[in-house]
Amino acid sequence: TSLARKVAASLDCDLVLERAEENPFLERFYRDPVNAALPTQLYFLFQRARQIQEMRQSDLFAPVRVSDFLLEKDRLFAQLTLSDDEFWLYEQVYKQLSIDAPLPDLVVYLQAPVEILVERVQRRGIAYEKNIQADYLTRLSDAYMQFFYRYDHAPLLIVNAESIDPVNNAQDYQLLLDRIMSAGPGREFFNPVPFQAR
C-alpha cells in the first residue's frame, strides 16, 4: 500500500487501495482464522466489487490508475483460508457478483523471503497484524508464487525485494520506479542491487 501511494504520487494519477482497515472482521481473523475467515473474505469480495463498479462509473477515460491489489488476490486468499464448504459458498457468491475488473497495464509482484516479510509487517506497526504467524506468511508467499508462475493476463514485473526498501529508501524507490516505467510486455524479472551496497 505504501509503495502504491508513492507510485501514484510520482505519476500524478488515481490511487485505488485495498481498504483493509474498513473490514470489521479482519482483526478477529488474525486472532481466530478458522472462525473468521469466511466473513473476512466475503467482506473483501463485496468491497472489491463495489470499488470496481465505482471505478467503472467514475472516469472511464482515466489514463492511469495505481492499485495495491488484484481482484484475483481475493480468490487466492479465500483458497488459502477457507474450508472446502466455505470456499464453495465463496465461489457461488463470486459468480453471482459477475465482477468485470479491468485488466491492468502492468502488475508488479514484490518477492521477499518470509523472514523479511515478518520484519516488514512488524515495522508497519498495525496492531492486528502483529498476530500474523510466520507459517501463515509462508503459505501465503507460496500461494503467491504459484499464482504468479501461471499468471498471464497482463504484463508482469517480478521484483526481488529482499535487499531493497523502495518505501523508505529514496534511491531504491527511484530504481524501482524507473524499472516500472520501462517495463515491456510479457514477464520480466528485476533483481536490483540495493543502493547502499553499490
Tell what function each PLM region has.
Residues 122-130, 136-198:
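NTP-dependent small-molecule kinase module
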Residues 1:
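Walker A/P-loop
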Residues 20-23, 71-73, 112-117, 163-166:
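Conserved nucleotide-binding/hydrolysis micro-motifs of P-loop NTPases
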Residues 16, 67, 106-108, 157-159:
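Hydrophobic/aromatic beta-strand patches that form the interior of the parallel beta-sheet core
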Residues 74-145:
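A glycine- and Lys/Arg-enriched "phosphate-lid" helix/loop adjacent to the NTP-binding pocket
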Residues 36-102:
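Glycine-rich phosphate-binding loop used to anchor ATP phosphates in small-molecule kinases
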